[in-house]
Amino acid sequence: MSDPMKTALSLVPMVIEQTNRGERAYDIFSRLLKERIIFINGPVEDGMAMLVCAQLLFLEAENPKKEISLYINSPGGVVTSGMAIYDTMQFIRPPVSTLCMGQAASMGSLLLTAGAKGHRFALPNARIMVHQPSGGFQGQASDIERHAQDIIKMKRRLNEIYVQHTGQGYEVIERTLDRDHFMTAEEAKAFGLVDDVIHYRAETEKEEKD
């Protein structure tokens, strides 16, 4: 059975631009990167995290003050991969705006709420899901015990991050994340995961004058 993600990527459209040196072709994602737009699409894993972190660092080097937009449609994935993206978002100087389109579940929801305060958005039909980390281990009993201790520490750290970005109390976060907890865009706003639900893009000053 073919991988839907690979199939989609093989169909990425090209954009042709006219420059003073003639025509130049970009794939659509490279063209959007020029506009400081990065996509997190699909499961969060090491390969994706490396690409997202590289794009964040590149855009910081290009302009350390101009906002970066992160568009998220992800079911979540590997915690350490997500934390690599999270730490890079906090590390770089430009503010990072986040927007959920489709879904932001598990690590996707953490990256959504990690955007700059006042710049975290969701589209009206987006779904957000939060929960505690999960894992399965095998081996010697002592190793399983150590893995269990580590995932408990990881759970505590993730809870602290949600507390920091949502403004909710630790007990509320712990209770909410105890099981899969699904939210509409408006519910995510009320909970503090996002700052606003966007129904349409506002006109710019230039567009209004035109």
From Swiss-Prot:
Keywords: Cytoplasm, Hydrolase, Protease, Serine protease. Pfam families: CLP_protease (PF00574). The active site is at 106 (nucleophile), 131. Its EC number is 3.4.21.92. HAMAP family: ClpP. Cleaves peptides in various proteins in a process that requires ATP hydrolysis. Has a chymotrypsin-like activity. Plays a major role in the degradation of misfolded proteins. This is ATP-dependent Clp protease proteolytic subunit. It comes from Bartonella tribocorum (strain CIP 105476 / IBS 506).
